Amino acid sequence: MRRLLIAVLFAASAAVAPSAQDADLRSTASAASMAGVMTPPLSPRNANYTITARLDPATRTITGSETIRWRNITARPAADLQFHLYWNGWKNTRSTFMRERALSGGNDDRRRRPDEWANIDVTAITVAGSDRTGTRRFITPDDENPNDETVMSVPLVQPIEPGGSVTIEVAWTAHVPRTFARTGAIGNFFFIAQWFPKLGVLQEDGWNCHQFHAGTEFFSDYGVYDVSLTVPAGWPLGATGVERERRDDAGGTTTHRYYQEDVHDFAWTTSPDYLVKTARFEHPRLPPVEMRLLLQREHASQAERHFDATRTTLKYYGEWYGAYPYGHITIVDPAFQSGAGGMEYPTLFTAGTRWLAPDGVTTPEGVTVHEAGHQFWYGMVGNNEFEDAWMDEGFNTFSTARAVAQVYEPNYLALRYFGGFVPWVFRDIALSRETEGNRLAGYRRDAKSDAQSTPTYRYFPSTGGSITYNKTALWLNTMERWLGWPTLQRALSTHFEAWKFKHPKPNDFAVIVNQVSGQDLGWYFDQVYRSSNVFDYGVQDLKSERDGEQYRASVVVRRYGEAIFPVDVLVTFASGERVTEHWDGKDRWKLYAYDRPSPVVSAQVDPNRVLLLDLDYTNNSRTLAPQGRSAATTWSMTWMLWLQDCLLSWAALA
């Protein structure tokens, strides 16, 4: 095991900082990757798709066919094939997706017109030349909802044995909806994702092919995608992979052929309104990447901001975790009110901005860094987003906050007025990585809603995001402040190297953290992952009384929450003396008593704010020389100044 760890660590180090002797090899590999070719193969390539599809914008219809070459890489025979038909989750209000969406307080979709819903209908399917169209059926492995049609099972004439392969031919039609879950159309803007019948993942215990849920995303195997898309002539198109061929057809259409190896999904977009920009990422120790931006014309002045944020991601994630291997990436600026912003797919992602995007505010930078970062956490490390979404969303939220802090601090609070159209930047309120970057406020609200070890698809729909994104970012940042960034960085890069183009599970990460840190951190993961208990430490009481020539001081600290973490207690005296106590945090309370020639002034639990998961930092300190009056005066004056500025600004518009 130790030799394996050393080998993995060495490989991770090599991935982050390759030697100059490998320059020629990197150059050759980079040229191939820019054509969508990955040599040698990076993944098992056991689910390969050749797809042909045509979009009719007038009817919002996609007509498609696909050939899937699938190989059974498990040790169990496959008696059936199971497919995701995601768009049936938006077919009506009775699907599991829509039922859960209603629970989360989403839009009232009953007001949608009939043509604003979606569907995907498989019209024919053959397996190894045998017509299986009449045998297909919908199954509901998660909730037995008889109205859900998002998983299709096709029984096989003969099981596919371990190591065996099969060719599957599928034909289907689909109706493009008014946007659901960042997929769909508005006007002539189309963003098309999860749009084809896609195989689930066969594992040793059977098919992992969950129904489509409102609070979860996706899971699939890696392979080669060769996709030909026919759209109206003159409409720019962006997609996963590299465009290998473009052919003008009769009837005013153009067919674009895109190709990419070693990815687990394929998404695309087209619109006559896109402005196309290109740029390049270069780095002395990382492979170059061609960047292509599909931009709304009203955002033309923000092109470089999108490119710069993408460069930030490729640089810092590449240095911290491992190189981005594909030689290209497509950035999509979605149409106004499309609802398609902030989503990730292999080698392509959607960002999101506004016409008025002032400097000092991370719009579009924040969402661009986050979605580009998903190329690493989700794209290359392919965790199961149905069950363990925190392994990409949480890792990526932590990484986003760290990368943004490297480049874009200070960034400021901004509020929007007049329906979100006019921004107002409060340049005396800088946002911090530790709180706003890690989304502490959202976690506080939902901290007890679910244990993180609960499969993601079983989280309560309206609170799952706080557990998936926010809690993970906070406990990772806590580990950084506690163990040190060098240790956590080695753990994350080792995990990345060990599990890229594979499907890790939560314990795989915990094992690597223990190995790299040299500690058994099971107690920590038991609390942050397997429990919904919360952390909350504070100072309950602080006293100082004169006793002759001395002062007798007492400090009572308390664990208000159920979760346990070691914390420091800083006690400060009027003489300037500072005493730091190290408390294991296990007892409900602890008393510290002192005899000193000067009185105690204040006490503070966790003065360096290591425990970012602490729900209530306002109770962490007490002072015997309160500054409440001056604080109230300061805040009152500040708010009055803001109010005056706002009134003057609005008056100027009158």
Locations of regions flagged by a protein language model:
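Extended, low-hydrophobicity, Ser/Thr/Pro/Gly-biased non-transmembrane segments
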Residues: S104-A124, A128, T150-V157, T167-Y274
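N-terminal, polar/Ser/Thr-rich
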Residues: A20-T63, I186, L521-W523, Q527-V528
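Bacterial N-terminal signal peptides
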Residues: I6-A14
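Hydrophobic alpha-helical and helix-loop surface patches within well-folded domains
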Residues: N46, L85, G89, Y258, ...
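Solvent-exposed beta-strand/loop surfaces of large extracellular or lumenal domains
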Residues: M34-L42, K91-P155, T179-T183, V242-G251, ...
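Beta-strand-rich binding/interaction modules
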Residues: G238-A239, G522, F535-G538, L542-N608
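Ligand-binding face of N-terminal immunoglobulin V-set domains in extracellular IgSF glycoproteins
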Residues: T61-G89, T93-S95, G105-G106
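Short acidic/polar inter-strand loop motif in beta-rich domains
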Residues: W90, A174-A181, P607-N619
